[in-house]
Amino acid sequence: MKKLAYLIALAAILCQLIGCASVPAASDDGILIVTTVFPPYDFVREITDGADNVTVLQLLKPGMESHTFDPTPADILAVQNCDLFIYTGGESDQWVTTLLDASPGAEERSVRMVDLVDAVTEDHIDGATHRHDHDHEDDEDEHDHDAPDSDHLEYDEHVWTDPHNAMIITEALCGMICSLDEDSAMLYRDNTDAYLEKLSALDDTLHSLTEQASYRTLVFGDRFPMRYLCDAYGLGYRAAFPGCAAESEPSAATMIYLIEKVREEQIPAILTIEMSNRKIAQAIADETGAQILGMHSCHNRTTDEAATDKTYLDLMYENAAVLKIALGVTE
C-alpha cells in the first residue's frame, strides 16, 4: 500500500508538471470508461458500438495477471479522470480501495461488478490445497474451512463465467452509460438488446451440453475460476486450489485425492486455465491417462488473443467446446 500511495502522489505531481494530455480524460465532448479486466471492457464495447464519442480503456494489458497487477501513474490518472470506472471488487482489486479513497469523487463514478450480481465467497473444495494447509498442516478440524472467519471471506471474482451474470452486468452498465450520454441512449439500448440475445444463445448452448453430459464433475489440475459457471449448470468440481489462490504447489494429499477421483469416476479430461504451466495437470494425466484441456476464465486475453481481437463470446464458446469433451457429450 505504501507503493500505491507513492504512485498516487507521483501521478498527481506528473499531472501538474506535464499536464494530463497523454492520458485519456473525461470531457464535455467525450466519455471515458475505464475497466480493470477484460469482460466489462468487452461488454462496454458491445454497448457503445457505433458511438464515436466513447473511449474504453482496459488497465490490464494483454498477457498480464490481474492478481499481480500494480497500476502505473498513467493508470491512476485514467481512473481519476474517467466518467465511469468498472472493477471486479475481489481480492485482486485491493489497490482500488486505496486509490478511490485518495481520489475525491472517484468512488461515485465507480461500480463493483460483485455488487451487481449474487456474488459468492471462495468455496472450500474437497481435496484442494488451501492456505490453511500450508500454514497449519496439523490443524485438527476440517469443518473450520467450511465456516471461515468473516474477516477473511474473499469474493470469488470471476462472476462473468456465468452468462446469466454477464447479462445482468451488461444491462446495468447500459443504464449507467445511458445516464452519461442521454442523446445516444437509443443506440446503447439497441446494442445491448442485440448483445443480450447473443448471451442468451450462449446460455442455451451450455444448457444443451450439460443436459447431454455423461460426466458431471470437472477436475481442474490448477486454480479454479469457474465456480459461477459450474453452479449455473449444476456441475460438480474438484481442483488443486480454490478460486485463483496464490499457492502454486499442491499438497501430496491433494494430488492423491485428484488422481483417485479421476480414476474412480473415469473422468476423461483434466482441465487447466489460461496462462498455466500445466505441471499439475500433467502429473495427474501421467497417472490416469486422462487428456489435458484448457479452459479460459476470460479475466484477460493473451497477447495473441488480443491481436486477433477475440471477444468474451469467442472465449466462452471455446470453453463450451472443451466442456463437450470433458463432459463426454457424444452428439
Model regions and ranges:
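Sec-dependent N-terminal signal peptides of Gram-positive bacterial secreted proteins and lipoproteins
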Residues: 4-23
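Extracytoplasmic metal-acquisition and chelation regions
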Residues: 20-331
